[in-house]
Amino acid sequence: HRLSSAASDVYKRQLHKKINEVSKKYLEPHGDGYQLHFTSAVCIGPGESKQILHRDRGIWGGYLPRKVEPLMSTIWAITEFTKANGATQVVPGSHKWDKDRIPTEKEIAYAEMKPGSVLLYTGTVLHGGGQNETIDESRTGVFLHYALNWLRQEENQYLSCPPDVAKDLSPEIRSLIGYSKGGYVLGFYSDPHDKTATYESVSPENMFKDHLIDDFSSYQTQQN
């Protein structure tokens, strides 16, 4: 987790043009924008058992109407993905299934891919990490998921990437993380440094402007 504050190659993946075009196509019919939902690097080592098949939309329980697609998930291959070393199991077409339908083995595909490749699937598609049957080969992937900006993020981006870290990122990355407003006032903040209450419904991006905040010491994460 905490990849939003990690490295420049992660930023490039987060802002990848094609990924964001696909995310916009599938998500924006259900809202006026999307945000980074979850970041993680996952390594499946030799002998690891397969993950239970699941839908990522389950993070919000069963409260969202099925017709609403809340999530676009991506897995970037850092190492080669093979069926033998735990390539992700995916069930094509399962986004249209009844939620209780169980796939047969023949209906499960494996996302075998070379390093640098990326798997995309919506939050309604059944999937899960594969079993690593090798004795000396690990499978590593970077997970970057995007969700509608009116839903709570699975990873608390504002703790994983607090303002004193986010100030060094590009405005595009900050906006994707959630340092921005959705719709008219969703996600606004009250500036604790504005003693006169001059500004109302302030966009979080404003906190990175010098005329509002010059010192981020009050936002820094305390070390134990």
Model feature map: region roles:
Residues H1-A7, Y11:
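Single conserved hydrophobic/aromatic residue that forms the stacking wall/gate
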Residues K18-Y26:
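Amphipathic alpha-helical segments that form well-ordered structural scaffolds
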Residues P29, I59-L64, G130-Q131:
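Short helix-to-loop capping/linker segments positioned immediately adjacent to catalytic or ligand/cofactor-binding
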Residues P29-T39:
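A short coil-to-beta-strand element that immediately follows conserved catalytic motifs
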Residues F38-A41, T74-W76, V142-Y146:
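A structural signal for short, well-ordered beta-strand segments
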Residues V42, E80-F81, T124-V125:
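Short Ser/Thr-interspersed hydrophobic loop/turn segments at strand-loop and sheet-helix junctions
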Residues G47-M113, T140, L151-C161:
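Catalytic core of non-heme Fe(II) oxygenases with the double-stranded beta-helix
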Residues R101-L120, V125, G130-N224:
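Conserved double-stranded beta-helix
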